[in-house]
């Protein structure tokens, strides 16, 4: 990881053949939406005529009780979804990925990356059908992790997983799958709580996708078009792309979203790459016939089955009408502000103003203690810092560094 001095981030320029009744059709459309929203990682919800094709297949998608029945919920009809991209080189049972897969991922051995949540995006979908907002949380933000003190926000998952497994082993548990499954549940609980405490807003649902899942998603979509402002080449991630628009396969797409070396703002530029990829994937699902191809839909289902975990009981039927505009471009991504860079326990971290971050999220979602507050000089001054983290809009193929 690059070495950062304590400097301002501004200076680190980074989609039935048979007839259906309306009620039954809605149920099936909702189930299709449930699959697609996870696979695109920004909830691609749409009621396609091919919904019947996957109807009986969706129960195989992993589910989790980590959110908790008593967790705070949004009270205004809107929905907040935490999207977690897990940087592990292992499958859901803790087994190492095959060597040929690791080679394609250009991600090194299964010992690298641990269980870091290297991608964290809070997606806010308003109740009125307005523009959805995606808030990217830089993975190295120094925050309070319950039970573990201050550390990088991405580490909450792995720290809690390791602690849970140690406790289980002390109780005599030796079954590897049980250790993996219960450890991951503890990790999800900790990551959700850490993000919720940091942002000060409810988390209604979550979706987790693995590193290999991201790779397989891009392949299942038959490539995703992206756009770069400048040519890049990086031996660490495997990124080697010319400037301009280009279509990337799964291996290339993973390199595109993982590169940070050689980018002027390092991790912050990588975050914008992730946002641009998601915006492009949404646009592609809506525009190139993904939802009319049974073969492609089956491929997407298989990606979800092996690589995606959702919170249990996610009833999407009530959510379809809210989110139906996402694939039409009514979504915008922004990166939450970073004050400076420093060292913590020998590692590079982002220093953040939690009050500013909370205010930014709460005001833009209309939730929390700061919702509805306007007009202060302090708030107007805060808005200027948005210039250092330009927004990424949906509805096309955005160009990024």
Each language-model region and where it sits:
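Non-catalytic, solvent-exposed segments at the cell envelope interface
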Residues: 2-401
């Amino acid at each position: 990881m690059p070495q950062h001095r304590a400097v301002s981030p501004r200076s680190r320029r980074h989609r039935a053949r048979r007839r259906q009744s309306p009620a039954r059709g809605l149920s099936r459309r909702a189930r299709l939406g449930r699959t697609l929203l996870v696979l695109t990682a920004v909830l691609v919800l749409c009621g396609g005529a091919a919904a019947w094709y996957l109807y009986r297949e969706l129960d195989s998608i992993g589910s989790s009780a980590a959110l908790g029945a008593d967790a705070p919920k949004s009270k205004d009809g809107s929905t907040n979804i935490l999207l977690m991209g897990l940087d592990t080189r292992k499958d859901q049972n803790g087994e190492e990925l095959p060597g040929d897969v690791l080679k394609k991922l250009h991600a090194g051995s299964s010992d690298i990356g641990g269980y870091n949540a290297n991608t964290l995006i809070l997606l806010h979908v308003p109740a009125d059908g307005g523009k959805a907002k995606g808030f990217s949380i830089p993975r190295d933000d120094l925050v309070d992790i319950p039970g573990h003190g201050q550390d990088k926000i991405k580490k909450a998952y792995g720290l809690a997983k390791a602690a849970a497994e140690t406790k289980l082993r002390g109780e005599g548990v030796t079954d590897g799958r049980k250790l993996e499954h219960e450890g991951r549940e503890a990790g999800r609980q900790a990551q959700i709580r850490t993000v919720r405490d940091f942002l000060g807003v409810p988390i209604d649902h979550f979706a987790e996708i693995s590193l290999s899942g991201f790779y397989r998603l891009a392949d299942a979509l038959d490539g995703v078009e992206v756009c770069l402002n400048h040519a890049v080449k990086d031996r660490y991630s495997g990124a080697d792309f010319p400037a301009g628009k280009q279509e990337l396969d799964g291996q290339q797409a993973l390199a595109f979203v993982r590169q940070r070396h050689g980018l002027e703002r390092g991790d912050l530029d990588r975050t914008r790459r992730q946002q641009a990829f998601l915006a492009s994937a949404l646009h592609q699902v809506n525009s190139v016939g993904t939802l009319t191809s049974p073969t492609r839909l089956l491929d997407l289902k298989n990606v979800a089955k092996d690589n995606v975990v959702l919170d249990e009981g996610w009833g999407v039927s009530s959510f379809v009408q809210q989110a139906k505009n996402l694939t039409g471009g009514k979504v915008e991504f922004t990166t939450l502000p970073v004050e400076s860079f420093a060292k913590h326990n020998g590692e590079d971290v982002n220093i953040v103003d939690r009050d500013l971050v909370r205010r930014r999220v709460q005001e833009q979602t209309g939730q929390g203690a700061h919702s509805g507050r306007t007009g202060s000089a302090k708030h107007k001054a805060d808005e200027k810092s948005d210039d250092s983290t330009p927004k990424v809009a949906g509805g096309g193929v955005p160009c990024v560094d």
